[in-house]
Amino acid sequence: MESINQRKPSKMKIDHVAIAVNNVDEAAKEYQQALGISEVEFETVESEGVRVAILHLKDSRIELMEPTREDSPIKKFLTSRGEGLHHIAFETDSIESEVTRMKGCGVRFLGEIRNGSRGTKVTFIHPKSLHGVLAELCSHQK
């Protein structure tokens, strides 16, 4: 049996951590000040019903998400849980093969692979598959 130290590390990396907020402008200012980040990008993702502030860190980023409509999943999250950590995203080079591999391990997904912002392919892993944590798999255009 191989030991943990002999296993090859995953090629996945943490892409971003997403936080649901009521006011993305106020939250972005607070995060900028607290973390010493000079620039913030703002983007609206119509398909998800959110306005996002993107704060770049050394090897990943934080995405602050505010709902833009009542049927947004983020609006539902804020109503039931309040502000806070929404999901963690893992980047992979081949989202299709990772989804196939994970399904073979019994991992459940919330929907199919779809287009996210800026040509990124995304899908979400059901929280019951990861001990209560909602996770996103993403694959960026090269």
Feature annotation, model-predicted:
Residues S38-T79, R118-Q141:
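Conserved short beta-strand elements that form part of the metal-binding/catalytic scaffold
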Residues A27-Q32, M102:
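Conserved active-site tyrosine of GNAT-family acetyltransferases
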